[in-house]
Structure formats: C-alpha cells, structure tokens
C-alpha cells in the first residue's frame, strides 16, 4: 500500500487533472491520498471533495508555503513508501509506481525516482550508464552538482521512502530550509544538499510517465 501526498495552491483546474490522471494510471494499491491546499481560500476545494470523497483535503489559513505543507503531509503518511505530487502534473500511462518501487527496493542509496519526459528535465543531465533493478526495471542516475547546486531532489512526481525523510530531517524539511515564493527552487536545492551529503542519488526511469501542466501558471504570493 502506498500513501500519496499532493501540494496545491489555488489552481483547482490543474489539481483536478492531476488527480484524475493519477487515479487512472496508478498501478499499486493506494492506502490514502492527502491534498494540502495552501491558497488560503476557504471552500476552494468543495467541488473536488464531492468528486473525490476518498481524498483527505487539508485546508489551513493562512498560507504556510510548500515546505511546511510537505512536512504536514508527511506527518500523516503511514506507509513505508509514499508518492509525492504537485498540483500541475498529468500522468500519461501506467507502470511507473511498480517500476519506481523496484528501483528503491534494489538500491537503498537511491532516494527518489523521476518520472519526467526527457524534454522536461529542465536541462538536468543524467549519467549515460543504464542500470537494471532486481525485477529488471531499467533506469539511469541523475547527475549531482548540476550547475554546482542541483543534485536531483525534486518535489515533483516521485516515489520515496518515508524512513529517509524521518532519518535525514528529524525536524522536517523546515529544519533545513524555508519556502521563498520569489525563488521557490531554492528549497529543493537545500533539501537536495542534505540528501547528497548523506550519499543519496536520484534515479530516472527510461521513459517519461508524467507531463507538466503548469507552464505559465505560477502560484501567487
């Protein structure tokens, strides 16, 4: 069983697409889905609660930022592995969860598995070698030290171990970084530095399973 966490911030049309496509193609049993809504707007998800009664929506006021939202979500996760999403990704096909799990179970030093299309990796290079997990899943490793500061950590669609988070971040992500709406990528970099220092790397599947929906639809402060 896998718990699923989704961060959302006022883009309910995209959130709806994200949830619908994920549910359509999820290929492992889901325990619980949690959505943290950080728009600060009451009632914004009322229509989605009707569409998705199985989802627990967390809707605090005021806004807290993505880092504290993630920490809140992860405090609710009870499964060994969890899948994390943002509100602006569409899932394209099935098989990504089982393949990601194969990699994480085969390689304890891999912290997450990317699902992005090759042209949506923001230029982040991968190592040329192709590896196989225990059940045959092919993957590559995401290069560390890209532009001197990117090590492969992403808050986008990935499967992760809850134990890694609890071990490396005893005070949560908020213990090592804060969310800056003007430079939201900096928190990913700072969290990534912790993973790199501990010897972790990110992997990517050979084929892309998700596509970004949010180009030009940035969250507001």
Locations of regions flagged by a protein language model:
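C-terminal catalytic/acceptor-binding lobe
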Residues: 17, 150-221
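N-proximal low-complexity "stem/linker" segments adjacent to membrane-targeting elements
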Residues: 1-20
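Short, acidic, metal-binding catalytic loop of nucleotide-sugar glycosyltransferases
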Residues: 21-30
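Short beta-strand-to-loop element that shapes/binds the nucleotide-sugar donor at the catalytic cleft/hinge
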Residues: 113-128
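A short, glycine-/small-residue-rich helix N-cap motif at loop->alpha-helix starts
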Residues: 61-68, 74, 92
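Conserved donor-nucleotide/metal-binding helix-loop-beta segment in metal-dependent transferases, i.e.
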Residues: 94-115
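Short aromatic/hydrophobic "clamp" motif used to bind/position activated sugar donors
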Residues: 82
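A conserved acidic beta->alpha catalytic loop
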Residues: 37-45
